[in-house]
């Protein structure tokens, strides 16, 4: 189901049983000063059974498709930047920001207001604490809990 106030650009491919809530903007051109508002041939691909609640923005790719996996839960006011690759079973809590070109592993859980710098990679099974800031230089490994600004390893994630 797509809420009537959501804006879904023609370059968006939705999987089965996807929910998109009020005020979402999915598939808009990337916001980058070098190529502001220029449409591309790249898409936003959203996997099956993904829930995207209100006021979420997901930008189209500039060099590849922006991909959201299956069974993801994206809460209010999240931003996913251009060319991001988000694996299956990822949770993005309110106000999380995923920069352009980021790669997010399976089952990662982002706390409220967490920020992931462009081109950063977050391995599978990680928990990113509320307000944490992940840079492209943050040393990360699978199933870790990372907190702080800049983020650091706190402990193993006990799923």
Give the positions of each predicted feature:
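Short metal-binding segments enriched for Cys and/or His
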Residues: 81
